């Protein structure tokens, strides 16, 4: 069974960026990676990258590759099935290393992938950053798609092409501008987030409202209870507004030399300012 998005829009990149567009697609209900990626015959090599926190949320998809219990899989682990490979890494910022980026590259190399392959990150900003960076290097650049699983990655981290990893004690020191071809968004992933991660994502939402969207500001003011209870319809509206605002900013300032730099602020004061209103 194929799955159809309930909404979509295009992020168009500047002519001089070297990139065309990112298709951003929204889906309803529970995440259905099997229908998205496994329902039709596939002849393309694909590398799916996720982590030990996300694997238990995608048990049907994981069981396509292995009989191991998704809760018990150790990182790093590699599983192969037909033309597809699954790479499971450790979860969290401490795993955002060049070693794990190279683990992704190595998984593709050991699977004998060609330049027509596809990398897919299923996770938050750490996963999309590393997978996008690995895709930019493998065979001098292969296609990449993101399935964001956190509010922060839905509204910010997965959109716009910034990829990379930490190096020694330096955060995001190495990387590349390399946008995804497609971003597939299920707001249902947000229901499983720990409260602190959900609040962190709200910081980006508050910042976007303050900088770009009176409509979003009004939603945050008048529907706070629905926001905090993670109402799916309200979340979809919030994510859509934020994603479109981020897309517009990226189009105007792809290499982060002007207005886009403002998007780096707000992770600290945003959550506090909203949750204490």
Region spans (language model):
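ATP/NTP phosphate-donor binding region
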Residues: 1-118
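Conserved small/polar residues in nucleotide/adenosyl-binding loops
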Residues: 275-277
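Short glycine/serine/threonine-rich phosphate/pyrophosphate-binding segments
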Residues: 126-132
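Acidic, metal-coordinating catalytic segment for phosphate/diphosphate chemistry
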Residues: 267
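Conserved phosphate/pyrophosphate-binding and hydrolysis machinery centered on Walker-type P-loop NTPases
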Residues: 259-262
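A glycine/threonine-rich phosphate-anchoring loop and its flanking beta-alpha core
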Residues: 16-18, 132-225
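Conserved, helical-rich catalytic subdomain that frames metal- and/or nucleotide-binding sites
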Residues: 228-248, 253-256
């Amino acid at each position: 069974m194929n799955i159809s998005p309930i909404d979509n829009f295009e992020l168009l990149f500047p002519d001089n960026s070297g990139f065309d567009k990112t298709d951003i697609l929204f889906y309803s209900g529970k995440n259905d990676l099997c229908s998205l990626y496994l329902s039709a015959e596939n002849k393309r090599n694909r590398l799916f990258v996720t982590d030990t926190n996300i694997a238990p949320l995608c048990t049907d998809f994981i069981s396509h590759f292995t009989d191991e219990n998704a809760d018990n899989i150790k990182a790093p682990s590699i599983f192969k099935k037909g033309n597809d490979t699954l790479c499971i890494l450790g979860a969290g910022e401490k795993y955002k290393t060049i070693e794990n980026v190279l683990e992704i590259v190595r998984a593709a190399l050991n699977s004998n992938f060609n330049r027509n392959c596809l990398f897919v990150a299923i996770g938050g900003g750490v996963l999309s950053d590393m997978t996008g960076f690995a895709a930019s290097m493998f065979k001098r650049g292969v296609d990449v798609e993101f399935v964001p699983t956190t509010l922060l990655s839905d509204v910010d981290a997965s959109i716009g092409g910034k990829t990379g990893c930490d190096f020694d004690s330096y955060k995001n020191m190495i990387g590349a501008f390399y946008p995804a071809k497609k971003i597939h968004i299920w707001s249902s992933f947000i229901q499983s987030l720990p409260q602190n991660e959900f609040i962190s994502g709200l910081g980006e939402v508050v910042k976007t409202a303050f900088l770009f969207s009176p409509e979003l500001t009004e939603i945050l003011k008048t529907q706070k209870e629905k926001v905090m209870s993670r109402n799916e319809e309200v979340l979809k509206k919030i994510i859509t507004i934020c994603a479109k605002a981020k897309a517009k900013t990226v189009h105007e300032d792809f290499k982060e030399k002007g207005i886009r730099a403002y998007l780096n602020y707000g992770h600290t004061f945003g959550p506090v300012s909203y949750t204490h209103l």
